A protein has these predicted regions:
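Active-site loop-to-helix "anion-binding N-cap" substructures in soluble metabolic enzymes
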Residues: 1-320
Length: 320
């Protein structure tokens, strides 16, 4: 992985891929937390200071959950405010308008192209069902149209690094590629964790993106890095099913609709091979009449989804 530090950027056209995917207000669609946008500012400043012109490609929301799927005009406005520098938004990713604008970019100019998730080639179902490798992705419309316009590609999207999509894996096949300072920093920190630099090591894996959790679980169990793995969220649900716990038809249907039941077999293997290292929820919180109610796992109603781990689980995890 090559660092951007010291690279001659004078007069170069740079394709920057950050992760500025942000939570939005459900009604107004205003950005309610711009932390990821703020973290992108240093690499943009570095590129501008070096004399480059910058085109940004990024995503907002996901086709598995359309609530946060919007254009990037408000992201452009935020970046402009933090930089105190003009940032243009163009509602096109790789069509004629985008190509024409990128060709005309001058040093010091910044343009944010349209939401990548509006492209079929970048959506989750395409990534999951088609399963192309990096070389094949170079033949996508997005990469064929954009790659010839740039001198180099900078990846600053560590939080999206698990994605097998053209914007994440294909441009480095065709362009000189560098890691932005944030990606480089986070990569080094993760490398230390994965290689057991600090002991004891406890991993807390939860949330809805269980591909991330299971992607990390396998190596840290196999190489002995993890002393304990505490599961919650959807990851915890899958583990409970693998352990033979009846979590109800509604939960199973939810996991099936999200195409997540495939992780159950992996979970069974991990529980068999590492029974003392993996902890699962012993109680959960559900909603009853608009109120939070905590119940043991074996008492969980079969027609509801759990919202959170319960106090008993929290207490058990604190003891680790």
């Amino acid at each position: 992985m090559l660092s951007l530090e010291g690279v001659d950027l004078r007069g170069k056209k740079v394709l920057l891929r950050p992760d500025i995917n942000s939570p939005l207000d459900p009604q107004s669609k205003e950005i309610v937390n711009d932390e990821r946008i703020v973290k992108t500012i240093p690499v943009i400043q570095m590129l501008l200071k070096g004399g480059a012109s910058v085109a940004i490609i990024a995503h907002q929301g996901d086709t598995l959950d359309y609530q946060n799927l919007t254009d990037l005009s408000k992201h452009a406005q935020k970046i402009s405010e933090y930089l105190d520098h003009p940032v243009e938004y163009l509602d096109d990713v790789c069509g004629p308008a985008a190509v024409q604008r990128v060709k005309a970019l001058k040093p010091g100019e910044i343009v944010i192209l349209g939401n990548l998730r509006y492209l079929t080639e970048e959506v989750s179902t395409f990534e999951r069902d088609v399963k192309l490798d990096a070389a094949a992705y170079t033949k996508t419309w997005e990469v064929r149209n954009l790659a010839p316009l740039f001198d180099l590609y900078v990846n600053e999207a560590f939080s999206a690094a698990h994605r097998n999509s053209p914007s994440m894996v294909a441009f480095q096949e065709l362009l000189p590629t560098y890691a932005g300072p944030l990606l480089f920093q986070e990569y080094e920190a993760l490398s230390k964790i994965l290689h057991g630099a600090q002991k004891p090591a406890v991993f807390v894996l939860g949330g809805a993106k269980i591909s991330d959790a299971f992607g990390m679980m396998k190596p840290v169990l196999e190489n002995g890095t993890a002393d304990k793995i505490l599961t919650s969220g959807v990851t915890g649900l899958v583990m409970l099913i693998a352990a033979g716990i009846n979590v109800g038809e509604k939960t199973v249907r939810f996991l099936k609709d999200k195409d997540l039941l495939g992780f159950v077999e992996d979970s069974k293997e991990y529980l068999k091979n590492y029974p003392d290292k993996i902890m699962m929820p012993v109680d959960v919180a559900i909603e009853e009449n608009g109120k939070r109610v905590e119940i043991d796992i074996d008492e969980m109603p079969k027609d509801t989804l759990y919202l959170d781990i319960g106090a008993k689980t929290v207490a058990a995890y604190r003891e680790v």
